[in-house]
Amino acid sequence: MKAYHKVRMYRTDVQGVCDSLVYNSKDSCMTMYTDPILWNEGQQLLGEQIKIYMNDSTIDWAHIINQALTVEMKDSIHYNQVSGKEMKAYFINGDMRHIEVIGNVLTAFYPEEKDSTMTGFNCLEGSVLHLYMKDKKMEKGLFIGKSNGTMYPMDQIPPDKLRLPTFAWFDYVRPLNK
């Protein structure tokens, strides 16, 4: 199946937009081309190309290829952000549970206390990062190999550090219904 020009898709668990889409029933892979964006709950994923692998009627995993970015909105000012060359997002029962970020990894995120109070702002970089999700939010991250970064108190965050260079928030184009 092929769809062209201003493709929009909606399911309760995932939404997406792109210019064109190809679905291959042999390997149950849906490939999104040209400015693809995928949303799962509060997570936005984007890259140059997104491949979504299905298992029956649910998403098994997604491969975000080149200039990969995931963004989670905390509030209207604060966003958790991770970018890299590529990402692999793994789903269980329609919920994203694990993201593997590979190559030139940059992060900008707000660690939280148990009561959701933001404790500061953490900027890190490395080569491979594993993110783990719980209750539809980022729970923890683990860099593989060397990483470096800086933790800023909330009142001392440099304005130029608030957004990664590739930051984009496209909630205004997100399909909200069928």
Which residues are covered by each model-predicted region?
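Mature-chain termini and adjacent capping regions
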Residues: 1-178
